[in-house]
Amino acid sequence: MNLSRRTFITSAALAPVACGVPLSYEKGIPVAAPKPTPNIRPPQIGQEWTYIKKDVFNGKTLGIITERISKIGSTIVLDRSSADGAMLPSEIQTSWGMVATDTQWPRLLNFSPSLPLWPLELSTAWSKQFTTKYSIPGYSDSRMNWQEYMSVQGWEQITVPAGVFIALRFQNLINFENSDPNIVDCIR
């Protein structure tokens, strides 16, 4: 059997394995906690950021999203738009960092009470479990259980197109009740 045929057979056999392996999450370089510990800056109307939304399983770009703070009052509203200018559903926070309407899932989720988007304390020893209920717009009588365990993993140096930053790495473990009663043990 010649070399090119062996290579083809081997690569054909391994191709399905490569398709099933998810992409890894980006990791920064571990660093010591900054002194003094930074504060989370408060929101300001007009503040905006743009990011690339990717599918973590295949690396495909799902879109380029811009979020802009449009309202600060009893709630904080982040207007969202796609690269072509189309308006997307707004994210709503009850206070800065406490999400009530989350747009990051395949369907819009409304949480009551709201959930933190980042650790409540910027400390490497911090972790906490949150229990709430969520509903899907159009089905608000159906409130389902949501448990989230958030834990800090440490400080790291990350490099992004905007520059090099020191960031706090944290992890969420989510256990939720699915709106489809046939789907159980939903853990993310």
Task: Spell out what each predicted region is.
Residues 34-160, 164-167, 174-185:
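Conserved functional acidic sites
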Residues 23-36:
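Short, low-complexity, disordered segments immediately C-terminal to signal peptides
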Residues 7-26:
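N-terminal export signals
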